[in-house]
């Protein structure tokens, strides 16, 4: 046995006590002896837990506050830093993101393409691939991206963002982004961690806004998935997106004539080539009777299924759903990170959390803006008195020996006016008065100064009203988002209750029964003999 390790028998011989659970905590190596010794069980137990925790918290599972995985958050943060209104090369965005994400350019590039294909946060230019056909995006040096207007409206605000040091300590990155929208439910997510996974289906933009408004009003709401690929969905067992639920998604199939079926939309997660292959394989196995499959997909999905002579199109339709990728079952698993731990929630709980978070962020923004306006009002009042009273022209001020003496004199002259100010006058305020240029003093107009002060007071009053009615203000926010962006996101997936298709009956219906009366044979392969029934 190697000198580098000892097993449990040797450990017991050395009279090292073993805990009741049979595991040892990992201990530093014993460097007193010539050989380095580790205790295997403790080492692997601790290291595996560290690895599992890292993958769960830092790689695969989204955070409930902003609905983003770390790599997505870092991409958006980098794009905001690069943002000047113009498109940036994806290769440049990937390189910039590597300042914050230590896992290489490939993972960043793939995550960026997935974000772009969801058509919500990123405005894309160039060949970004096709989720319908499964075609990949062009090389990063050929495609460009910038933040969408929606992302700029709802995702960023440095004043309400909590920051942390990046992995190498050279930069700051957001702990979570201040997203004022249920982004996690709009985009959906899929991630496989160690010991758990997360699969949240995407939902409709307008329905999310309506649900948030209903929640704020204390009304009931229901949310069901909506997919970019369209199709139809049976949500009777959705179970609010919780573990154990399931949805069935079907392709949209139209009957052109008795001999031809047309597939116009494919199920979520499937591609046109994949659906075509599944139909061909089902045909080869004798599950369905078709003559050929023709893929005419370009901008829109168009798959023509040409039926064999004498085959019923209605029965073939059922067989396509039963034996091909024209129908798929999806099991959601709503797992998110909250307070540095994974939690399994319902879709409704996620929306409520996101809506509460939005309300909190809007309140913070109002309070920050109010504080800035109060500072502006305070200094505008100081400036008005400083210039109107011509304090800067007084002999004692002009003969001040130094800045401290000048500040002391100004403070003394302002003392009678203290009741007019909204807060105490500080030395920093007086130093700002000393920084006023003569050109500004010469252009001073009392009426304009009074108008400016009145306008600031009016804005403060408006903010106070919003803070007093913060729920109504948040409802108006969601309504604004719906009015501004909702037309781009109509529901694409039809909600339906599917009839149960029994595979055995469908196969039987696709078989024809023949009989050879002379030889006494009966079966489905005697196609030259007398036809009896389907």
Model-flagged regions — what are they?
Residues 2-24, 31-35, 40, 189-192, ...:
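C-terminal interaction appendages of subunits in large macromolecular complexes
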Residues 2-244, 304:
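Catalytic phosphate-handling regions of large nucleic-acid enzymes and associated NTPases
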């Amino acid at each position: 046995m190697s000198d580098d390790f000892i097993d449990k028998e040797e450990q017991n011989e050395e009279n090292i006590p073993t805990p009741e659970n049979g595991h040892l905590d990992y201990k530093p190596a014993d460097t007193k002896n010539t050989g380095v010794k580790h205790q295997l069980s403790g080492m692997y137990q601790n290291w595996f837990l560290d690895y599992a925790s890292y993958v769960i918290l830092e790689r695969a599972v989204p955070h409930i506050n902003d609905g983003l995985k770390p790599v997505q958050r870092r991409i958006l943060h980098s794009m905001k830093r690069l943002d000047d209104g113009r498109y940036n090369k994806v290769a440049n965005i990937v390189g910039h993101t590597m300042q914050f994400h230590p896992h290489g350019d490939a993972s960043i590039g793939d995550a960026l393409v997935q974000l772009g294909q969801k058509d919500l946060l990123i405005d894309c230019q160039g060949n970004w691939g096709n989720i319908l056909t499964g075609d990949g995006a062009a090389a990063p040096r050929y495609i460009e991206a910038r933040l969408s207007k929606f992302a700029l409206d709802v995702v960023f605000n440095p004043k309400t963002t909590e920051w942390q040091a990046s992995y190498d300590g050279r930069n700051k990155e957001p702990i979570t982004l201040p997203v004022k929208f249920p982004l996690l439910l709009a985009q959906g997510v899929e991630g496989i961690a160690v010991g758990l996974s997360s699969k949240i289906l995407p939902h409709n933009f307008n329905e999310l806004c309506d649900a948030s408004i209903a929640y704020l009003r204390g009304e009931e709401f229901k949310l069901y998935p909506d997919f970019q690929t369209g199709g139809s969905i049976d949500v009777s067992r959705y179970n609010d997106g919780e573990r154990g639920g399931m949805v069935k998604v079907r392709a949209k199939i139209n009957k052109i004539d008795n001999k031809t079926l047309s597939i116009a939309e494919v199920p979520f997660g499937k591609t046109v080539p994949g659906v075509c292959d599944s139909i061909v394989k089902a045909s080869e196995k004798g599950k369905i009777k078709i003559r050929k499959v023709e893929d005419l997909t370009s901008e829109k999905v168009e798959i023509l299924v040409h039926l064999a002579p004498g085959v019923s199109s209605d029965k073939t339709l059922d067989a396509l759903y039963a034996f091909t990728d024209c129908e798929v079952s999806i099991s959601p698993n709503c797992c998110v990170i909250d307070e540095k731990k994974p939690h399994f929630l319902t879709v409704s709980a996620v929306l409520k959390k996101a809506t509460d978070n939005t309300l909190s962020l809007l309140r913070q923004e109002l309070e920050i803006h109010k504080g800035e306006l109060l500072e502006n009002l305070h200094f505008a009042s100081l400036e008005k008195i400083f210039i109107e009273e011509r304090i800067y022209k007084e002999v004692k001020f002009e003969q001040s020996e130094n800045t401290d003496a000048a500040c002391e004199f100004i403070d003394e002259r302002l003392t009678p006016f203290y009741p007019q100010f909204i807060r105490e006058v500080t030395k920093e305020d007086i130093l700002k008065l000393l920084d006023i240029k003569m050109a500004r003093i010469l252009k001073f107009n009392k009426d304009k100064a009074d108008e400016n002060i009145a306008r600031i007071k009016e804005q403060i009053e408006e903010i106070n009203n919003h803070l007093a009615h913060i729920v109504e203000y948040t409802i108006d926010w969601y309504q604004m988002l719906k009015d501004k962006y909702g037309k781009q996101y109509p529901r694409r997936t039809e909600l339906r209750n599917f009839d149960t298709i029994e595979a055995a009956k469908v196969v039987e219906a696709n078989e024809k029964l023949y009989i050879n009366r002379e030889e006494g044979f009966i079966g489905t392969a005697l196609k030259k003999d007398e036809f009896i029934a389907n």
